[in-house]
Amino acid sequence: MATTYIAYVLWPRWPGPAIDPNAPALPIVVAGVTFNVPPAAIRAPVQRRPGTQDRIDLSFLWPSLEPPDANAKPSVPAQGALAAPTPAFERIFVTISAGGSSVPPAERVLTIYPRYTAAEASPGPDGLTVLAFRDGTPYQGEDLIYDAEAPGFLVRCTRRAGPTPGTCLYERWIETVKLVLRFPRDWLTDWRAVASNIDRLIASLRPSRG
């Protein structure tokens, strides 16, 4: 039931008109950077418009990276009934916003995280390294997970708490814009495919050149 509740909370419930799944991508500008966004991927109807916006919140089906059916509604099982498998954890969520005064991940690793992490790392899934944040710090209950052999893949993840699965945040900057992608920690067992799909997703949101 916990995963069903999370799916219900994550599902956008703002009222809005039906969306044509074949509608063309919207040119949206965030902090001077242009993105071409499928309307069905935009979670809030108020953000489904072209032009300049402060931020946009998106979701895509995984691993196809297709926009979800924005006209579908989540189902809540009857009391006492077993919950059906939820699609919430077959999605990747993306927030695009101005970077502003935020510190990029590469700098955070050098100047902020070392103050809060444990002294020693431990092996993670599929060759990754896990560095736990200490209790009593702002990141308590989270881990820093990265590829020690090559730079580029770094996520901050919550740990599983009972039936609630862990969630990872992956951050990418494009000029002055910050993209934060959220996905289940369990996906890290195939993190190389995750990283490749993230690259493909971000590239699909950018205007084509040439």
Where do the language-model regions lie?
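Short acidic-hydrophobic surface loop/beta-edge motif
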Residues: L26-V30, I145, Y170-R172
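Hydrophobic membrane-insertion alpha-helices, especially the h-region
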Residues: M1-V9
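Extended hydrophobic
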Residues: G162-V180
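Ser/Thr/Pro/Gly-rich low-complexity linker/stalk segments immediately outside membranes or between
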Residues: Y8-I28
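Extracytoplasmic/periplasmic/luminal assembly and interaction segments
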Residues: T34-R91
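Non-cytosolic head/periplasmic domains of membrane-anchored proteins
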Residues: P77-G166
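A mature extracytoplasmic/lumenal domain signature
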Residues: A41, R159-A161, F183-R185
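Surface-exposed amphipathic alpha-helical segments
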Residues: E175-G210
